[in-house]
Amino acid sequence: MDIQRSILIVALAVVSYLLVLQWNKDYGQPELPAASASMNTTQGLPDTPSAAGTSSDVPTAQSGAAGSEAADKPVAVSDKLIQVKTDVLDLAIDPRGGDIVQLGLLQYPRRLDRPDVPFPLFDNGRERTYLAQSGLTGADGPDASSAGRPLFHSAQGSYQLADGQNELVVDLSFSRDGVNYIKRFTFHRGLKADCSDKEKAQKKIECINENAYQVGVSYLIDNQSGKTWSGNLFAQLKRDGSADPSSTTATGVSTYLGAAVWTPDSPYKKISTKDMDKEQFKESVQGGWVAWLQHYFVTAWVPTKGEQHQVMTRKDGQGNYIVGFTGPTLSVPAGGKVETDLTLYAGPKLQKHLKELSPGLELTVDYGFLWFIAQPIFWLLQHIHSLIGNWGWSIIALTVLIKLAFFPLSAASYRSMARMRAVSPKMQAIKEQHGDDRQKMSQAMMELYKKEKINPLGGCLPILVQMPVFLSLYWVLLESVEMRQAPWLGWITDLSVKDPFFILPIVMGGTMLIQQMLNPTPPDPMQAKVMKLMPIIFTFFFLWFPAGLVLYWVVNNVLSIAQQWYITRKIEAAAKTA
């Protein structure tokens, strides 16, 4: 049984490592293209964001493909961006096209040592291109005009959500050929007023409004021309091939960076940049959403429910990757008015809010193939946090609950190990008796197990059952934005990254060593040497694992030691009195 147990432990380490390698292969960040790399290092480029640049950004209403890049000339960059600030968002809108070209998340600092610098989700400078575009294309759409994308006018150069104000509306206006357009952005207060500053700092889900990171975008079309106006609403996300700035793990693990869409056949369909390099994706869907994913954060366009849209992905001539959709044809008679709208989500992957916004959008929190186990674990962890208010202590409480759930299985395993420890002298005698005759030795061992009523797999099955739970918890701690920059106590200021002083991994190695002392010594000398190396090997691996995961492993080991010691002493005491 000890050999089988050792094989299982080694298998767990190997399987975990292979899963990491496979995840990187499937979902790792793409290498920065040579063209983009040279562009980023070019000197003299402006630091301020620029407009999209060409009308080739605009899809055609019929196919969703790119426009003619050869025929379209660059559009002049607008002189001044429109600044908008709420309690959770700090963004900039380019009047040329009305695109959101900058967006910072005020509640999520880029680094712990710089809490005043928000994490930059959108950017359109020399370092990175990532922005949200929307407009009107088609026969009479202003974004499809040969004159270039419309230059909107705003009554103010900056807008800010005032104290006590729950909604902020920003109107951009434009007129052409007798048609008046208003592009309206609606922003919402992110944090609930009845929550304390401490609760807001803890980012409790109960303190975040469900529309905190939703931006309403609507077009009001007033046709004062003498003919019927016809056009299509489009929305898309454009990003270059740069690396994920939110990926901070030190284990070599890269979470998925790429596009995803909702389709009738798949509520969560990934379309990586490698897929876009090969071919365009096009499909007609009703409702749904299109999104761009990165570690911890997501951006998604959600169209009007019930309408048919043409979803597409493509790669433009500048090496940027685009995912978006084009809506059905709108018709506005002369003298008539029409309003059409959609929603932009730009923020953290808050599963509850994403699910309420659109079905399937919560799946952008990608827990891998064990999602059906990971989601209940996260649900329980989140509810514990709502009571405790600290993610570190919540992980400890979750570990205790998981240990209690597996108590019967663990107890059976430890009882089997205790019996094995009791008969280890007999096992050693069998080995000495049969020497190198492994067949006879195995037969004698099985007879001994049968006589002593020992199940040789009794210590293995509990480990096999708990493997999926461990792997699921790994992805919960790695993928959940709630763990980002979440402190525990003392030196652990961020549970999502490695322990800066490696204290937890060393403690974990110590607990593994104590566990070995409680287990029977393997009869095989080579196996005994391998088992002695396991604490060192695991300690080395866990040096770069997220502190939250190492904390779980340490607490689990401590509870296992206590449980094993209690059961072993109980069995030994019963044997003495028998």
From Swiss-Prot:
**Membrane topology field:** Multi-pass membrane protein
Segments spanning the bilayer are 3-23, 361-381, 387-407, 457-477, 500-520, 535-555
Kindly give the CDD domains that the UniProt entry links to this protein.
5TM_YidC_Alb3, EcYidC-like_peri
User: Which Gene Ontology molecular function entries are recorded, alphabetically?
Assistant: membrane insertase activity
- Keyword Coiled coil recorded: no
Looking at the UniProt record for this protein, which Gene Ontology cellular component terms does it annotate, in alphabetical order? plasma membrane
Determine if Nucleus is one of this entry's keywords. no
The places in or outside the cell where this protein is found are: Cell inner membrane
Which family is annotated? Belongs to the OXA1/ALB3/YidC family. Type 1 subfamily.
Function recorded in the entry = Required for the insertion and/or proper folding and/or complex formation of integral membrane proteins into the membrane. Involved in integration of membrane proteins that insert both dependently and independently of the Sec translocase complex, as well as at least some lipoproteins. Aids folding of multispanning membrane proteins.
Q: What is this protein called?
A: Membrane protein insertase YidC
Q: Which InterPro entries match?
A: Membr_insert_YidC, Membr_insert_YidC_N, YidC/ALB3/OXA1/COX18, YidC/Oxa/ALB_C, YidC_ALB_C, YidC_periplasmic_sf
Region (Disordered) residue spans: 34-71
Q: Please give the biological process terms from Gene Ontology that the record holds.
A: protein insertion into membrane; protein transport
State the UniProt keywords alphabetically: Cell inner membrane, Cell membrane, Chaperone, Membrane, Protein transport, Transmembrane, Transmembrane helix, Transport
- Bias (Polar residues): 37-65
- In which domain of life is the source organism classified? Bacteria
Q: How does it assemble?
A: Interacts with the Sec translocase complex via SecD. Specifically interacts with transmembrane segments of nascent integral membrane proteins during membrane integration.
